[in-house]
């Protein structure tokens, strides 16, 4: 497995590491980036709420034991816990010692080269 860090930096956010993702050995850098991107997106639930099934009995299709949430979740005034946003264009993924940026389509280096 390769461990990568997902850094939310889009939308004017101060960059912060939100997750470490243990990526199975995949044949290409692009597939490694895609895996980290997919499993830090809210598609069928919440990637950051670490429950396989929600309190209402619905399955959390975005639960992945290979994802470790690094930034604490927030709670509102009523105590409701809220998950993190999806990884988006402008966010970064650190593989080894090199950062990649989520582009409009795919990924780029910090210098703007397509992956």
Q: Which role does the model predict for each range below?
A:
Residues 13-18:
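Surface-exposed loop/edge segments in extracytoplasmic proteins
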Residues 1-12:
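A short beta-strand micro-motif
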Residues 83-115:
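Short, compact, well-ordered microdomains
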Residues 24-95:
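Short, conserved turn/kink motifs that form compact alpha/beta structural patches or helix kinks used as
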